[in-house]
Structure formats: structure tokens, C-alpha cells
């Protein structure tokens, strides 16, 4: 079977479902398909995962970060006293807590790393990053990259790409505010439009909307927060399916269909506060699902490559059969003199 040469990755947003990416990465590590990656375009949780890949963290280190994060109250529990921050800070908490958690882990592997720009990451690790964000001041998408923003911190840009409105405070960069890129470009694949799809793995976390079931839930601040998260997810899905996906390229997308987690932001909201709820079992299931789904996907990609090469070679063979000889050698040439 022909060998894939993957140089570009695209990682969509997807909230907590991004754990599926971890299982997918484990399979890609086994297949040796991450060693040639030079460009990664991503949004939201995809941007966070892109940093794992860029900084060459092992799959065991990545899984350790995921499992430890869910038990960190500083990261996953927002007390009631923080509710005032929606007015004063425009968000219940800061996404910088998540980035600080990653930086602490990176400091073990790279003691000299405090902050890195897009240019520095490219020079040191050989990967060009592209993080999708939504500029609130201009109401438009902005992709931070080595070409457009070489001197911006990759960590700050990643924070902007992950900052869900109201849950997290907006990120200030060069005098303007940024939120999660899902509102404007949740699947930033067009930036690689000049790259052969044979060299790209594009991962999309997408789930069809569940049928609405009427309830008698009383409307209050807790209910509104839950519904905002749902609407955010609807916007994300619509933006992906309508604006970005190409039907002719569907066989080249990694798009797991049987995602069991109902909502991308699995949160519990009550009088004690807000908790990002993710169990060990859910993590285990998503990692396994990501692994098995990627295994099936890579098999399909190899078959596509094989069939493409087979067709190309058959075409070349046909051309050779049709080509005429440069000279006629069917008869013996006449001697120059009569002997």
C-alpha cells in the first residue's frame, strides 16, 4: 500500500470533544504520520492541541495533561462569587489559567521556554502555526500566523482562539479584543488552498443537532448560561457545514460521526457555581473513539492514494502503447551494394 506524506494539519474547534483529537494523535504517532508536519491551522481546542504537537510532547504527556486538568479546581470550577465578572471582566474566568497549566508542563521539558512568538516557534520547532480568532472590535475573523503576526506570542493567540464569550474573558492583543474563532472560522482550511489535499489531514469535530425536547425549566441565569453554550455550538456547526466543507473533498476529512457527548461544553450550573464536567470514563471513551476512527480514516486515505497512483500508472502505460516508434524497423534495410 502506498505511503502517505502528511505535511499539513487542520484542527477544528469542538470544546471538550477535543479529547477525541488525543486518541487520533495516538494513532498518527504509531503510523509515524506526525514527523513531517510543518504547518498546523487550528481553532479553539484545536489550537491547544496544535501546541502539543508543535512542542513534541509525547502522547503519554498529552494524556497526562488532559486527565490532570479535569481535576484541577482552578481550571474547571467557577465559584458563584465570580458571576460579577461577567459585567466587570466580560467573562466568568480567564483562559490564561489553562495556558499557565500548559506552560508549567512545558517548563519541565523545556526549562528555557517562557514565551515564544510565531517566528520563534517556526525557527526552533520547524512548525508554522495558524490560529483562528474572532476580532470583536471589527466583527471579523483574524488568523494569527508567522506571515501576518510573526512577533505575537503563540500562547496569547491560542488563548484568543479558545476564549468562549461569557465563559472566558476576551483577550487583548494590540489594542483590540478577541474571542474564539468559531464565530467566524471554526475550520480554517482555506489557508491551505494551494496545498495538495494528499498532504493534508483535516480533522473536524461535528455532531448533528439533537431533536428539541420541550421542558418546563424555569428561565434564570443558570439556564441562560447553558443555552448560550448550546447556541455557541449551533453557530460553530453551521459555520463549519455551510461555509467550509467541500462535498468533493469529503473523503479527505477526518469527521467522526458517532460522537456520544451531547454538548461541546459539558457544564453543570447551579447555586454553587459553574463546573466543567468531564469524567475519566468520558475521557477514556473519547480517546478510544478517536484512535479507532483515525485508524479507519487512515486506511481509507491509503486506499485513495493507491487507487490514484494505480489510475495514473495505467494512464502512462496506455500512452506508451499508443505511441509510435521513432523509425520503422519492421523490414531489413537494403545492403549498400550487391554482394
What annotation goes with each model-predicted range?
Residues 1-43, 51-327, 336-339:
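Patatin-like phospholipase
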Amino acid at each position: 500500500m502506498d505511503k502517505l506524506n502528511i505535511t499539513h494539519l487542520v484542527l477544528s474547534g469542538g470544546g471538550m470533544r477535543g479529547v477525541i483529537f488525543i486518541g487520533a494523535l495516538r494513532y498518527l504517532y504509531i503510523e509515524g504520520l506526525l514527523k513531517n508536519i510543518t504547518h498546523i491551522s487550528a481553532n479553539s481546542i484545536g489550537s491547544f492541541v496544535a501546541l502539543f504537537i508543535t512542542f513534541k510532547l509525547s502522547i503519554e504527556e498529552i494524556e497526562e495533561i488532559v486527565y490532570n486538568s479535569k481535576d484541577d479546581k482552578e481550571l474547571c470550577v467557577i465559584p458563584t462569587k465570580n458571576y460579577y465578572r461577567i459585567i466587570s471582566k466580560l467573562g466568568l474566568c480567564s483562559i490564561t489559567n489553562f495556558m499557565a497549566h500548559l506552560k508549567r508542563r512545558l517548563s519541565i521539558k523545556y526549562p528555557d521556554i517562557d514565551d515564544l512568538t510565531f517566528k520563534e516557534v517556526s525557527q526552533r520547532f520547524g512548525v508554522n502555526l495558524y490560529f483562528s480568532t474572532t476580532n470583536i472590535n471589527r466583527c471579523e475573523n483574524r488568523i494569527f500566523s508567522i506571515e501576518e503576526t510573526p512577533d505575537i506570542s503563540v500562547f496569547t493567540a491560542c488563548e484568543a482562539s479558545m476564549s468562549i464569550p461569557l465563559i472566558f474573558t476576551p483577550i487583548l492583543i494590540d489594542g483590540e479584543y478577541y474571542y474564539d474563532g468559531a464565530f467566524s472560522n471554526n475550520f480554517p482550511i482555506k489557508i491551505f488552498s494551494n496545498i495538495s489535499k494528499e498532504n493534508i489531514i483535516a480533522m473536524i469535530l461535528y455532531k448533528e443537532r439533537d431533536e428539541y425536547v420541550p421542558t418546563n425549566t424555569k428561565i434564570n441565569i443558570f439556564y441562560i448560561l447553558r443555552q448560550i453554550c448550546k447556541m455557541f455550538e449551533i453557530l460553530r456547526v453551521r459555520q463549519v457545514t455551510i461555509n467550509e466543507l467541500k462535498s468533493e473533498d469529503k473523503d479527505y476529512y477526518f469527521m467522526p460521526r458517532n460522537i456520544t457527548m451531547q454538548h461541546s461544553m459539558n457544564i453543570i450550573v447551579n447555586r454553587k457555581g459553574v463546573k466543567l464536567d468531564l469524567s475519566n470514563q468520558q475521557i477514556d471513551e473519547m480517546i478510544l473513539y478517536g484512535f479507532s476512527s483515525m485508524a479507519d480514516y487512515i486506511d481509507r486515505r491509503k486506499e485513495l492514494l493507491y487507487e490514484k497512483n494505480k489510475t495514473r500508472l495505467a494512464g502512462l502505460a496506455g500512452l506508451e502503447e499508443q505511441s509510435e516508434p521513432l523509425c520503422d524497423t519492421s523490414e531489413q534495410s537494403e545492403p549498400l551494394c550487391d554482394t
